[in-house]
Amino acid sequence: MTALVIRRALLDYARRPLNLVLLVAVPVVIVMALSGELAAFSKLLSTTSSPTHLEAATAGWAAAAVAGLAGFFEVIGSRTTDRRLAADSGRATPVVAGRLAASAVLAVAATAAALVALVARSGINDPLRAISAVLVVAIIYVAIGVLVGTLVRSEMNGALVVSVIWMLDVFVGAGLGGGSSVITRVFPLHFPTMVLTSQAAHRGGPIGDVGWSLIWAIGLSALAVARLAVITRPARHAAIAPALGEAATPPRQTVSPLSLPAAAVTPAPSLTVTVTTSDAPFAANRAHARSETRLAAALRAAMRDYGRNRVLWVLLLVVPVLFVALAAEQTPTKLMPVALVAGARHFTAMISLRHVHAAEMASVASALLAGIAGLFVVTGSAEGDRRLVLAGFRPRQVLAGHLGVIAGAAALTTVVSLAVSAAFFSPHQWVPYAGADLLIALTYAMIGVLLGPLTGRLGGLYLILVLAIVDVGYGQTVMFKSFPPSWGAFLPARGGGRLLLDGAFSSGSAQIGYLLLALGGLGALTAAAALVFKARIGMSRAQRTIPAPPSAVEVTPLGLTRLTGPLAAPEQTCGAKWDPGARKSEGRTER
């Protein structure tokens, strides 16, 4: 049973080949693209680590990101299946062991990819230390992912929790500046990072950094195993019911009225109604009013649906507060040069590093949360969206309802992020600064809407997580130099990032070029997302129209309806499928 669960879990993970590609590609991108930037950031925060040692830490962080999300999706998507397997076999242990082993295989694959990238990037000075520490980090985050998967029911909420834990762990708990405050020590990655960067200096007391790392790994793993066993173990009544056999739950006898003999049905007069419709279009004003009604109904239904998910809105409120406040609090107040633009004037100003970090972390939090919201809102309602299209809604009306929810989530995270950042600095121009932050959030929300149908939830989440950090966190930052890196010009947040910095730290008018760049990128992403959404759930007019032969509707004595006519089958009742080959020109029968 255990081997079967492992095999099926890995095959299910590999059902989308992109998942396997990203399992290897994400650690490689994080190590290759961010290790140098993180080394510069660490020097900026007065760290004592050498760049090579800090690059070793990026391998652990990359493995943690992939392993945590892989462990979460392994559990959240198979809870019902695992419970049924445990009920059929009478034992939950093989199922739990198989699920955990499959998650461990994915963690080992992510660890191997991160270590190979580290060797290619800078080499490994101490292979034993690096391999063991990165593996411990992967185990810690697999346990976190599994634990979150057993505690939450919504994939969106769980993905947000795992992603935010990882980002807080990297930006706050890892101790990039070489510090080890009380706040940083409560994060799981702090002590393994100290081991990876050779900064162990008895911060962990007599147990040591290695001891605390092992305590984190063993403790979280034990909690994850216990929780997974609890939710997988079949309920008592589910285990007793199969033993009772058919006597416990006798099958219900269902008799179709149409299968009864003719003598069983008392003859009665039947009412025959023939309804035909023409193909003439409705009046323009009536069609316009119906379109507005459907658009409002789609928006109202989407808001009501996600309004019930109170945990989501709590996360959207709490996460920016924690992320921005903790990141800014750990940043020193030293001055640094920042290149700014005020109208036609280009100048360099000396600004506190804490102010810059608070401003930029607000945009990172907004981008990440809005992107995840866009991804899960679209992918979580595909079947319902298709039903709405069959009911007569146009794909653009359905998409508009989803975009209303996504825009609300993006606006909420933006407002909260700006409010928290305002506790650390006061922007020179609130409107350009807030508008730029909102543009970045909406841009990443559209990226989530675009990626969801193309890559699936897990693949899209990997891409959004990496892109938000690489683009907003490092591609548009001025914390390493006085101006953003040149390679960031090819990423989506360049226009909004420049507007954000100029609005936060200069008093001149915004540059029209960057504003047009941000709006143009948002418009292009929205158009692309609409096309992908329509291709996924949209249907042609012929598919939405149910042609029927010219027949009559007979109301039977039992209150059922039956087609009469030369093409009606004897057993055909209302609700059966029409012949798709029938011609629309012959009319349509309304039921």
Please describe what each predicted stretch is.
Residues L100-V152, V210, L403-T455, L515-L516:
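Alpha-helical transmembrane segments and their short interhelical loops
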Residues G68-G90, V338-V341, A370-F393:
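Transmembrane helix boundary and interhelical loop/hinge segments in multi-pass membrane proteins
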Residues M1-V26, I30, R236-A248, V255, ...:
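Aromatic- and glycine-rich beta-strand/loop motifs that create alpha-glucan
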Residues A25, M32-L38, E155-H190, A325-T331, ...:
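Transmembrane helix segments
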Residues L23, A67-G68, M194-P261, V265-L271, ...:
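Alpha-helical transmembrane segments of multi-pass membrane transporters/translocases
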